[in-house]
């Protein structure tokens, strides 16, 4: 088992534009990692990911642009059991995953400490549906602009009318409630 003592594994496979697949990284011990931003960002030829569902991300505070621009990914491993309770930044996590049709059931993620979820599903053009994220605790989110912008294949959205948007930036309040621009 590979152990990462460094609290950051940012940009690990970033811009590996010719990379089609990865070796088995499922047994990596990342329990000490705090920053996972941009790990696969721009690896636009990746067609699949190894099973990363058992990664212990309980100390991670930054997941921004994690799968961003993985334009050839059709699905993401089942990351539904990830402990996201310490994550503050989820900006652009699935940004421009153009071929992604479905997401794992992320409805039970604890995002109560998240402050930024803007562009999370931005330009996921093939995404047909979303898990029921209506029960996400968004009380600390300050920026959720363009959350679903460009998700032109979405048939419906979960009922997010009860999300707490009281801490969203005032200058972005009109875009804060994110149902804008799903074309």
Predicted feature residues:
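Negatively charged
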Residues: 1-183
